[in-house]
Amino acid sequence: MSASGVAGLVQGLAVVLFGALLGGLLGGVVGAVIGVVVLGLFAIPYGRAVAHGEMYAGDALGIWRCVLDATWSVPNTAAGAIYYGVHRLTGNTHDVTRTKGSGAIWLVKGVVTKYATTIGTVKAGSNEYIDEHEMIHVFQARLFGPLYLIGVGLNYVVATILPYWLLFKNRRKITGFGSYFEDGVYPNVWNELWA
């Protein structure tokens, strides 16, 4: 088996084991079985994408990323596996060339036309102009591990209910309900300000 095949197997197994752990914590043995089955359905195509796309470079950094994604950052990896699976079911294409050695899976189309979205190690809709920004989100997930998605979610809630960003001098103008989120909340949550 090739090194990328091993990486794909490791990532897929990590997602399944995370499903067992999360399911077991929430629902005992039955929950663990459900977690294995549900996340297993996403782990298989995700692991294949990691292997086929040769996502991890064969150097020390690539190995370190693979280890982090299978351990400390496994909640983000599992969320990314689900995200990848849903995108593939809706016809999105895996760009294998751009994935190779990048440390992230590159999907061609985004969720929303003019935006890229990254969950875990899966980037949807990125391009050469904004890819550095999206890779910062992948880095943030690896750095903060199990705290990352919770921190991002909580910051979105706080920024929506308590719009602290209205105090910023260089903020975008709010022109309506949609603009409140697109021009107010979204660009002013911590992970976007950093990226």
Locate the predicted segments by residue.
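Transmembrane alpha-helical segments that serve as helix-helix packing and pore/cofactor-lining elements
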Residues: A49-L61
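Catalytic Zn2+-binding segment of zinc metalloproteases
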Residues: M135-L154
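Transmembrane alpha-helices
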Residues: M1-H52
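Metalloprotease/metallohydrolase-associated module, dominated by Zn2+-dependent proteases
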Residues: S2-V16, A20, A60-R88, N92, ...
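Active-site scaffold of zinc-dependent metalloenzymes
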Residues: K100-Y129, A141
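A generic short-segment signal for beta-strand/edge and adjacent turn/coil regions
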Residues: V36, I44, T90-V96
